[in-house]
């Protein structure tokens, strides 16, 4: 579910890198880990792609067919529906069994994580209204806020922060949401949101001893935004 499996500067992320053998099966990988591929982000490919258009043009019948296949596994269906922005399905499943709201997949992602990284605000709102845990962490220690900030889903990140998400939560690699936003070249809005929050601690370091500003200075054209916190007590490298 984590859409990120490497840094944007081409350096593998130490807590998310995958070690593939020479003969790994790509189709099998897509089948088992397809949820790790971003569904709400823009591609850098500028050409025309009939295949991409076909992907975007799946009709209601296709979605209902997929739901029917998963109907006997409501937890799996809820995770899928949250990622695919199927609000009616999410509501139906939670009305039948509200405890599924915090169900998890094999990587410990919850429906809220999936909706957050996909940028589906309506789903996020519904899940939180039904008791979704904004502090839930994956096997790598990612919260839903990490997922939203990594993929520049600013409105989702803002809503999560309004509902007690920890802006300074750190993953197993000691990455904060600000670290992840700083490593995204398209994250201007999310960086502004985080840096203008009175509780943000931009001086926190990851396990490579880097602050978010260090990452932004290396990878982002928006490193100047860190001037927002320059001179603030929170901007000193302290936890």
Curated annotation (Swiss-Prot):
Pfam family, one: Ank
Positions bearing Phosphoserine: 49
Organism domain of life: Eukaryota
Tissues expressing this chain: Widely expressed in fetus, at a high level in fetal liver, brain and lung.
GO BP: cell differentiation; positive regulation of DNA-templated transcription; spermatogenesis
UniProt cross-references to Gene3D superfamilies, sorted A to Z: Ankyrin repeat-containing domain
Location within or outside the cell: Nucleus
Broad class of where this protein is predominantly found: nucleus
Entry annotated with the keyword Lyase: no
Keywords on record: ANK repeat, Differentiation, Nucleus, Phosphoprotein, Repeat, Spermatogenesis
Example of a GO cellular component annotation carried by this entry: nucleus
InterPro entries in alphabetical order: Ankyrin_rpt, Ankyrin_rpt-contain_sf
ANK repeats (start-end): 73-103, 107-136, 140-169, 173-206
Keyword Cell inner membrane tagged: no
Function: Induces HBG1 expression. May have a role in spermatogenesis where it promotes autophagy in response to serum starvation, via the NF-kappaB pathway.
Name of this protein: Ankyrin repeat domain-containing protein 49
Gene: ANKRD49
